[in-house]
């Protein structure tokens, strides 16, 4: 009897997880015209699981690049890096567009919660020494004329190489750790400041106690 109850409970949990996966619109490509977000299907509870799943997926993709036994090349390193993190990019694009244009208290709270998580994830990519070495190797190949890239390919390589440099990939371990701390703190402070500004703007009221000051306005505005 206990075994039956345990089996049924396990099945219920698995079904719930499967249903949650199937109903989260961020877990698959948007099936709308032009790939526009399914705003009518997106709910506040979808964002955090999508952020975490997106981070998990990109970590696995980065790991595959780093652990590749192939010689670093444009396709297996730069293109693979550029193609990583599709789920994360999808949820970030929608979430931050809405927090800028149509936010609410729940969205603001989530943005403060997820900011340091995303900051850490970004540092884990651009301070990853093994990944940086592969990107730098491809960049060096082009500098030495060992590979020929199109204008678009060169632009992509240059973008990622400079992103690693500017993100501190060339710093020693101690400075990188300090940079991680600063980035994490800045990510939280930036969101907190933005939310404070928004709250102040929303709380603003203009009191007009002299009707003459409304001269020139249409009647329907008055």
Each model region followed by its residue ranges:
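Zn2+-dependent metallopeptidase catalytic domains
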Residues: 17-222
